[in-house]
């Protein structure tokens, strides 16, 4: 049975998928979380074989994070499911609603 992953797990998976080889410090910075809270999430993801840590070749103190096979499959399922839901919602909306939605998304992305 699959373990339940919360929003923190999904955010970490997403960033690791988008930035293969990201190290712990970079991930903490991008997620704006404490090392302690991220460690719990990473422990869960490693135990579930979603991600793997590989020691940095240039700096042995650093560990680089990558999606494992299981993590790649899981990410694709979640991503495709979300993509389908968004596509269907936009397809069944008026052009005015779509424009308003794009404006809201832009504000979210810009942090306003």
What are the functions of these language-model segments?
Residues 43-100:
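Charged, amphipathic alpha-helical coiled-coil/dimerization segments
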């Amino acid at each position: 049975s699959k373990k339940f992953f919360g929003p923190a797990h999904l955010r970490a998976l997403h960033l690791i998928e988008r930035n293969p080889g990201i190290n712990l410090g970079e991930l903490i910075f991008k997620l704006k979380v404490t090392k302690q809270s991220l460690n719990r999430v990473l422990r869960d993801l490693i135990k579930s074989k979603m991600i793997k840590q590989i020691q940095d070749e240039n700096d042995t103190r650093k560990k680089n994070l990558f999606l494992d096979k299981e993590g790649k499959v899981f990410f694709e399922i979640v991503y495709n499911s979300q993509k389908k839901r968004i596509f269907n919602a936009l397809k069944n909306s008026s052009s005015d609603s779509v424009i308003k939605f794009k404006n809201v998304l832009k504000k979210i992305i810009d942090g306003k």
